[in-house]
Swiss-Prot record:
Physiological role: Component of a Ras-regulated pathway involved in integrating chemotaxis and signal relay pathways that are essential for aggregation.
Name the UniProt record assigns to this protein: Ras-interacting protein RIP3
Gene Ontology cellular component terms for the protein in this record: cytoplasm; plasma membrane; TORC2 complex
Similarity-based family: Belongs to the SIN1 family.
PANTHER family: TARGET OF RAPAMYCIN COMPLEX 2 SUBUNIT MAPKAP1
Keyword tags: Chemotaxis
Domain RBD: 648-717
Disruption phenotype: Null cells have serious developmental defects, because they are unable to activate the aggregation-stage adenylyl cyclase acaA in response to chemoattractant and are defective in chemotaxis. Cells are unable to properly polarize in a cAMP gradient.
Compositionally biased intervals (Gly residues): 621-631
Spans annotated as Disordered: 66-97, 157-290, 305-336, 522-581, 594-646
Compositionally biased residues, Basic and acidic residues: 310-321
Native species: Dictyostelium discoideum (Social amoeba)
GO biological process terms held by the UniProt record: aggregation involved in sorocarp development; chemotaxis to cAMP; negative regulation of phagocytosis; positive regulation of phosphatidylinositol 3-kinase/protein kinase B signal transduction; positive regulation of TORC2 signaling; receptor guanylyl cyclase signaling pathway; regulation of myosin II filament assembly; response to electrical stimulus
The keyword Lipid biosynthesis is assigned to this record: no
Amino acid sequence: MSVYCELVDVVQQIRYKTQIFYETFKRDSIAEQIYNFSNESTSEIDPDIPFSKSLDKDYSLLYRPVSTSNNNATSGNSTPPNNAISPNQQQQQQQQAQQQQQQQQQQQQQQQHQQQQQQQQQQQQQQQQQQQQQQAQQQQQQAQQQAQVQAQQQQQKPTTATTASTVTTTPQQQPSPNNTTSSCTSSSSGSSSGTTNTTSNTTTSTNTSTVTSATNSSTISSLTSTNASTSSAYSTDQQKPNQPPQQPQNISQPQNISQQQNTNNVQQNNQQQQQQQQQQQQQQTSTSPKKCKIVTFTGTSVKLNSKTLQKSDKTSEKENKQQQPDSSKTQQQQQAQQQQSQQQQQAQQQQQQQQQQQQQQQQQQQQQQQQQQQQQQQPVFIFVKEKVNKVNHDLPITPPPSLLTRLVKPNSEEAEYGDIVPPPGMGLTLSIHTGNTGAGQLKVRVIEKATIIQTIFATLKLHHNNGGTGLIPDPKAYNLRIADSNGRIDQDFPPLDPNQYITKFKDEVLVLCPNPKFDLKKSSSSLSISGGVPQQNNNNSVNSNSSNNSNSSNNNMKSSGFQPQQSQQQQQQTQQTQQTQQQAQQAPQQQQSQQQQQQQQQHPQQIQQQLSSNQLQPDQVGGGGGGGGGNFHRTHHRNVSSGPDAPLVVKITLPDSSITKVVFQKTMLLKDLLESTCKKRKLLISDHYFTLENGQTCNGTLPMEKLGGADLILVSRRPIEQMTALSPTDTDSTGSSSDLQQDIFWYDALAWQYKTYEVTKTKKYGPKQDRIIGIDRERVTNMSPKDTETKRPARLIKDISKVALLEKPKYFTIEYNDGKSYIYEAKTTSLANNYLCK
């Protein structure tokens, strides 16, 4: 061979393979295939290298390691080339060797597992065989007894039978548990005429059957019996037509019976020995290749009596019967196995049911634990101890309305202002002075998101529930102001906005003050319905409230606290009402109804008389030099005190839309008020003047007493020049210079009307967008002219922190509380001014 190897393992494998091929092709005399075993192509074979075609030579010696490369591989003269295996091939061969080792290990493990199973099966088979042997012995004993009885009764009839003389077993190797190969040879000799003529008729039959290890012993015994019986029957059938049966000369009847018994005993002993040998061979393990087991039988033909023939027939029948119980036993075993499997399945089902029940119990326990934890974590009621004001029993107490009355009322105050009473232990607690000597300071509890108007409503409700009187139930009739610990109003702070949240002032002491803008005419009809004051005492309540309003303004200047004082007119009115009540009790019911109607008619008349004494008449305004007319209508009513030297307060709206309140005397003129207001705010007196809310200009020589508490508006003659310095070239092409000098007059009703403006919004980095901005009393809307949605379509007025004009004409900016600011450009400068004023 021309190939040399370096690895010893590869050489061993090649030797093993060459031996296999050598054995397979030995008889065919194909030496060329042995030479071409290395899978070399014909082109790679060296034709100069001779090789021997003798079959007796071992060609595995041609493969030698590298160390002996100098020697010739064959008897030829030329030396083959040294072809070494590459490292990659070595790695592949090593990997293949490792894989083969792993496969061998797995096969060994499987074989061990199978051997264990076979041992268990063999043990079971041994137990079954022992039981069968015991049963067979019992049956044999019974059969022997019956045979002895029958032998005496039956007549002698000559027959021929075969007896197994020798049984030789040659176990060369361990047989497989599933296959047994037996070759049975039987020779029979038949007697003719009077003498015993032995004719050697050898019949060789090879019976190959594949059975399990559990039935090896039984099959061998059955084969011996069946072969013997068939040979005997065959010989008798052939001899019957030719020769009649003759009795043997030298054998007597009792000797035949004893000989048959001896042969049966010998057969049984041989069978037992064979079974024991087979069991021993199955237990012993060997790695040598398996070989078959050959069993030979020899037989002689003798004449027997009819009794012995019948006995042999019966024994064969018994053996057949013994085989039948074996099949029935196998069926019983299968049934038992099925029952066991069913029992196992039932046990598994029971276990599963038990597991399910346990899981359900665990789930129930977990649910119970969760319920207990939830019950333990439920909130505990916190009882807050609050101070309760003492009720004045001299005054009549009206019970609070029931839930039914609240539901029946279509316009209930609670429905309007919402439920502002917080649950126990939550919300805010405020200290509010009512100005009523009987009530004093109240501790009012409201929710955190309550507004000022809702807080006033809660204060009036608490005052009414505690039995207090003297306050109007309508929360719009009052304002809240900041005060000190003694209840004195702090003049540095204006009245709080009704729409603001109360949380901003939760740490302050507040005072309930009358609202000068509250219209008593419109609310007079609701005073008798809302409760808190009886209908007959409506005049008292109105008069007392009017006195409180006037006295509160006086006490604000003197800082003497918020304590109402009754004037002489009010005392007279109270005396008149008391007299009317006494008369109403004595008069019949008809007179009472008439008096009530008269009182209702007098109620608005008295209010008008009080207001008309301090109110500015239209003729007086028209007679002034300020340029008025007879169409003046005062928008708000203000009550003033009747004292001769009592100071008064007037509300003034400044040009920057801010509101201030200024104290004045009755004898002060309007021009003096203008001078003091402008000096305080560093404004030019010549560029400003006062107007009323309806836009009428007031004369400077008009005394303040004749205003009647009307609100004033401070208007600038040149508002744009003061806010921005504009040159004539800065005016827009569409507008004119007259827009800069045009005066703008606004009042609340006009400012609250919804109006839209077309503007251009300038973004942060330069791009512009067309927008339509709408303004009303509460909000600012942001719309697109292309009917597309905007990011924020509306925002509230109260969220605006600042509005101002820019240096460029027509530009203005809006800043919000969240820190965002936007720049807009109007079409004209006047529209920008109108937007800011609105």
